[in-house]
């Protein structure tokens, strides 16, 4: 009798892409940081949108809106802490992702490496404009 994950049409797709994925043995945990960057970015976008629904940037009411988010919004404190810690986790994953590329010599693929460096500078400029300057 064969496994249901290999015979069921829907589970077969999931099995072939996640469980029995034909991947090289040199694929280590260092290669997960690209997908972790995607997860962190998704969390940042979602929590940022939900926080922006209640935040006011006026200098007279900005602090009051932050306390409103933490006290009155359902799980507002969780959104705020996920957004703050998600930014730190995003940069940790970003630097580890670039470090892995340096370690394995990915800079020899000049076109891909240059696009990655441009993305790195764009992310750093965006974060500087959005988090440091205000």
From Swiss-Prot:
A GO cellular-component term linked to this record: mitochondrial inner membrane
Cystine pairs: none
Residue intervals passing through the bilayer: 33-53, 77-98, 113-133
GO biological process annotation, one example: mitochondrial electron transport, ubiquinol to cytochrome c
Cofactor: binding comment: Binds 2 heme b groups non-covalently.
Xref: InterPro entries: Cyt_b/b6_N (IPR005797), Cytb/b6-like_sf (IPR027387), Cytochrome_b_N_euk/bac (IPR048259), Di-haem_cyt_TM (IPR016174)
Superkingdom classification of source: Eukaryota
Reported cofactor(s): heme b
Binding site for heme b b566: 97
Keywords for the protein's UniProt record, in alphabetical order: Electron transport, Heme, Iron, Membrane, Metal-binding, Mitochondrion, Mitochondrion inner membrane, Respiratory chain, Transmembrane, Transmembrane helix, Transport, Ubiquinone
Pfam families (UniProt xref): Cytochrome_B
GO molecular function: metal ion binding; ubiquinol-cytochrome-c reductase activity
List of residues binding heme b b562: 83
UniProt topology in membrane: Multi-pass membrane protein
Location in the cell: Mitochondrion inner membrane
Quaternary structure, from the entry: The cytochrome bc1 complex contains 11 subunits: 3 respiratory subunits (MT-CYB, CYC1 and UQCRFS1), 2 core proteins (UQCRC1 and UQCRC2) and 6 low-molecular weight proteins (UQCRH/QCR6, UQCRB/QCR7, UQCRQ/QCR8, UQCR10/QCR9, UQCR11/QCR10 and a cleavage product of UQCRFS1). This cytochrome bc1 complex then forms a dimer.
Family statement drawn from the similarity comment of this UniProt entry: Belongs to the cytochrome b family.
Other comment: Heme 1 (or BL or b562) is low-potential and absorbs at about 562 nm, and heme 2 (or BH or b566) is high-potential and absorbs at about 566 nm.
Function: Component of the ubiquinol-cytochrome c reductase complex (complex III or cytochrome b-c1 complex) that is part of the mitochondrial respiratory chain. The b-c1 complex mediates electron transfer from ubiquinol to cytochrome c. Contributes to the generation of a proton gradient across the mitochondrial membrane that is then used for ATP synthesis.
Name of the protein this chain belongs to: Cytochrome b
